[in-house]
Amino acid sequence: MKANSRKMATTGVKPAVLFLGLLGLVCLCSSPSAAGFRSPESLVRNVYAYYGDRTSALSSGLPHDAETIRQFFDPSLWDAWRAPTKAPYDFLVQSASWKLSAVSISILRKQFDRTYVTATFDNKGKPVTMNFILVNGPDGWVIYDVESPHDSLRAYLTQYRN
């Protein structure tokens, strides 16, 4: 025990300070990033994880709160997603209500700074295909736009903005 005390005294570091420093380092390294995802597929998978049976807040569609906006969207979409809308349906599932089948996710192409990902699923028996345009930002992958066969998320949010 004396050898350890002597060694600590010579380095000038007290055990409590060393412990707190290591604890702080572990907390910093294990905290999730404020935005983005590690892969394009994980981003799209996490979008549709919010579309369950509506028995909880986690299954009532992708939220419009600040934390979700920063995590999922490119800064150019933040204001549009946050703004109240009179939208007649949820663009990401193409319906006002949903009962989704398994979601199939595949990368269509990688082009310069963007990756195009297709998500296909059935919503109440109706086939739906959504094309996500994703960009790799400083904190990970985020949504730049989403396209349905008839519209884009950017145009949709602009059209139904209050």
Residue ranges and their predicted role:
Residues 35, 71-126:
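Surface-exposed, charged secondary-structure patches
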Residues 38-56:
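Short, aromatic-enriched amphipathic alpha-helices that serve as compact interaction elements
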